[in-house]
């Protein structure tokens, strides 16, 4: 049996389809002091979303364009100047806060990128532009492809490869495998936590299925693309996986992490934090994991399959071949327990897929009449 619909490009909802999102502080917890995070100011509507300040007992965190930035406040040279963003928001300088947060996502912002972003924001904020079309609509009307070209500018091979990774993500085998594994996630598992969400491709999948999802990443610019274009019904939070997860205990009912975990240095700390924020019995999926025998071109901290088996031991992991999961998916099925492999059988594999649970049991993937990646509409 093969589902009938062909794949779409971005499973994106337009802004008019956006549902009611939770308040920015809902379920947030400071990764530093462990205290609850609450609103310190009223939310104010600004360019591309709401702006405000959140706080706990030890720090304040800005909300820029509807995205809470839960990063540790650091000095003037920090990649994301959290304190400076807070001062801009308190002063009502929302356009400057947006530009600063977006530029801070770049390791080395190019002059051309700075100019193009500054000009676009100024144009969107001009009185004439506001009369013709609200700023958020100006950005939503701009394609995600064009925004990604701004995020990774220039003709260099590295920028082109990274840009194409996000543009053509729905057609990648590892993305298809992730949706096959995610087929076991049900509506009553919500909300789902999407770790290292990037521009929100997996978040769009859950939104199209009517499952609430929180997407987190350290890259504010990619999250902004996700919130405005790719998955506007999802909740986005900017945070650092190395610092732990900034959420309350047992807040999530499932989690998925695609092509990210091997870039995390402190893996044990992240998994300990994940066990805290997941409810009892929650399924978890770590997809497109690089392993140290085949680490790929980009610097990472991949482990051998046996290392992942040890690290995930408390979650009773099952290991799958990406090819096996994709083959099942193309036949209209999710993975079956019998498809699981012994970790050392995957030493030559490009990617490793892991399914586990937080004190529950393994579920078999469901069959589907419609490919999950064909849900939703073009952006």
Please report, for each region that a protein language model flagged, where it lies by residue.
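C-terminal lobe and adjacent flexible extensions of AdoMet/dcAdoMet transferase-like proteins
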Residues: 349-379
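Conserved alpha-helix/loop element of class I SAM-dependent methyltransferases that forms part
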Residues: 167-188
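A short SAM/SAH-binding and catalytic strip from SAM-dependent methyltransferases
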Residues: 254-265
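A short glycine-rich, Lys/Arg-flanked "PGG" loop and its adjoining helix->strand segment in the class I
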Residues: 268-280
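Conserved class I S-adenosyl-L-methionine
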Residues: 189-198, 285-307
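A short acidic, Gly/Pro-enriched loop at the edge of an enzyme's catalytic core
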Residues: 242-255
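Class I SAM-dependent methyltransferase SAM/SAH-binding core
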Residues: 199-243
């Amino acid at each position: 049996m093969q589902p009938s619909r062909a794949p779409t490009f971005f499973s994106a909802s337009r802004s008019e389809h956006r549902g009611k999102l939770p308040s920015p502080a809902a379920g947030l917890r400071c990764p530093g002091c462990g205290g609850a995070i609450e609103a310190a100011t009223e939310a104010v509507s600004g360019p591309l979303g709401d702006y405000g300040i959140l706080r706990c007992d030890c720090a304040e965190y800005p909300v820029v364009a509807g995205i809470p930035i839960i990063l540790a406040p650091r000095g003037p040279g920090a990649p994301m100047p959290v304190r400076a963003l807070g001062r801009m928001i308190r002063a009502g300088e929302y356009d400057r806060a947006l530009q600063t947060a977006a530029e801070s996502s770049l390791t080395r912002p190019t002059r051309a990128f700075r100019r193009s972003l500054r000009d676009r924001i100024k144009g969107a904020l001009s009185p004439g532009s506001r009369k013709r079309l609200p700023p958020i609509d100006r950005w939503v009307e701009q394609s995600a492809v064009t925004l990604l070209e701004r995020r990774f500018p220039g003709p260099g091979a590295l920028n082109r490869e990274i840009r194409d990774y996000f543009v053509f993500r729905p057609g990648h085998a590892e993305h298809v495998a992730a949706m096959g594994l995610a087929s076991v996630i049900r509506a009553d598992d919500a909300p789902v936590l999407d770790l290292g969400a990037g521009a929100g491709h997996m978040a769009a999948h859950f939104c199209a299925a009517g499952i609430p999802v929180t997407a987190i990443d350290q890259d504010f610019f990619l999250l902004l693309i996700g919130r405005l274009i790719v998955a506007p019904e999802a909740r986005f939070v900017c945070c650092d996986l190395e610092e732990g997860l900034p959420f309350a205990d047992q807040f999530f009912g499932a989690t998925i992490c695609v092509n990210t975990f091997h870039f995390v240095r402190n893996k044990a700390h992240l998994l300990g934090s994940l066990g805290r924020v997941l409810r009892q019995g929650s399924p978890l999926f770590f997809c497109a994991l690089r392993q140290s025998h085949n680490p790929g071109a980009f610097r990472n901290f991949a482990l051998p399959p046996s290392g992942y088996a040890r690290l995930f031991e408390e979650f009773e992991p099952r290991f799958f071949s990406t090819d096996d999961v994709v083959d099942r998916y193309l036949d209209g099925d999710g993975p079956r327990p019998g498809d699981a492999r012994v970790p050392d059988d995957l030493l030559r594999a490009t990617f490793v897929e892991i399914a586990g649970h937080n004190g529950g049991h393994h579920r078999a993937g469901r069959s589907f009449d419609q490919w999950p990646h064909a849900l939703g509409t073009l952006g």
